[in-house]
């Protein structure tokens, strides 16, 4: 089912680090990048559930509460980045009404004769008639030129998630992708990338 917003057109503030100023602390400050990434994730979690005409006001109100010291231009840059993601027609299945946000996943997978515990959070999960699509957001990161430039740690993360989901959906193919918000660019991982292999 679609997550409920209980009739509200607002976004609740998350419990995160104290706000940081990009003027005083600088955009390269780790706390600034962390807060920006958390806000982007929260906006991508909630905004798809709101009517399009309500998204901008809800986003501005939320970002202003979470980052009151940010210049207006910096806040708008974040909001526009998220809005650009939601407006890409090719991304529509990711944010379809039946998709789910922030899906907790836990279990064990077998790798190289060992059973490894896996505990994570899938940013977006879309279950369709013939496939299951899991998407992880990457914020504040350079966009890889192509799939071969994706860090191995990110590939491995998605491979572990895919391995946990496969037994739950035996009649559907499992697909995974990384969504870089600064593009926005969606890099789909090929089946080879989702195969679990011992670390080199």
Regions of interest found by a model, annotated:
Residues 1-200:
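Structural signature of nuclease core domains in nucleic-acid processing machines
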């Amino acid at each position: 089912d679609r997550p409920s917003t209980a009739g509200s057109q607002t976004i609740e503030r998350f419990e995160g680090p104290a706000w940081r100023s990009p003027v005083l602390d600088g955009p390269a400050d780790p706390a600034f990048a962390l807060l920006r990434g958390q806000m982007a994730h929260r906006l991508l979690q909630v905004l798809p559930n709101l009517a399009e005409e309500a998204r901008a006001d809800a986003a501005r109100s939320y970002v202003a509460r979470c980052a009151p010291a940010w210049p207006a231009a910096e806040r708008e840059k974040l909001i526009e980045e998220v809005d650009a993601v939601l407006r890409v027609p090719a991304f529509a299945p990711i944010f379809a009404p039946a998709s789910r946000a922030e899906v907790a996943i836990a279990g064990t997978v077998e790798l190289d004769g060992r059973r490894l515990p896996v505990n994570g959070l899938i940013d977006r999960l879309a279950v369709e008639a013939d496939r299951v699509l899991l998407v992880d957001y990457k914020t504040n990161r350079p966009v890889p030129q192509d799939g071969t430039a994706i860090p191995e740690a990110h590939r491995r993360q998605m491979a572990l998630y895919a391995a946990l989901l496969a037994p739950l959906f035996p009649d559907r193919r499992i697909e995974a992708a990384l969504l870089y918000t600064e593009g926005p660019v969606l890099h789909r991982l090929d089946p080879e990338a989702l195969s679990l292999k011992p670390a080199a």
